[in-house]
Amino acid sequence: MRKWGIFFILVMAIMCTSHSQNQVDMHCQDKAFDQEVRNWLQFSVPVIGVDQLHQAPQDSVLILDAREPEEYAVSHIPGAHYIGYNRWNSDVLRGTDLDRPIVVYCSIGYRSEKIAQKLMKMGYSQVKNLYGSIFEWANQGFPLVDGENKPTQNLHGFNEKWSKWILNPSIHKIW
């Protein structure tokens, strides 16, 4: 009986440790938006902040956009490749090493977390979800490009309800 008690304690300790490692001390600039993001994420995959991604050399990480094609066409993070959510497009992964660093994003992080989980199940080991996703990226003033890779101030807000979290006044919301 004592062995089972020790085993149970070890399993619980491992679970708590691995869960807390995923909950990196990330915050969005706006407290209300940060709380909204936290409410939607399960923290089932590691997260990376927009500052960290912005500072990373562009060729060092594969950036994947898990939104829908019409959202991606309006704007996306420079260097990002469309992978989709409802219309999954795994072609972008062809030839990608399983240990290549990958960052997935969507509007706030919910859809990208689901796609990141899928990638991890496929064997990709260095997958992260962009905390606050493209909304936080834009809110902090980082660049966006359109479908022709030209700079833009337009951002697809998914719908009117979710667009309220695009807080940067220089961004033109589209839905």
Feature locations, PLM:
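Positively charged n-region of N-terminal signal peptides that target proteins for export
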Residues: 1-4
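Residue-level detector of alpha-helix initiation sites
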Residues: 109-110
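Short, surface-exposed ligand- or partner-binding patches at beta-edge/loop junctions that are enriched
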Residues: 105
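Short hydrophobic beta-strand that contains or immediately precedes a catalytic carboxylate
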Residues: 53, 62-67, 80
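Rhodanese-like catalytic fold shared by cysteine-dependent sulfurtransferases
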Residues: 16-46, 73-100, 113-175
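Alpha-helix-centered segments that form part of catalytic cores
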Residues: 44-51, 57
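A general structural motif
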Residues: 59-61, 99-101
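Bacterial N-terminal signal peptides
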Residues: 6-15
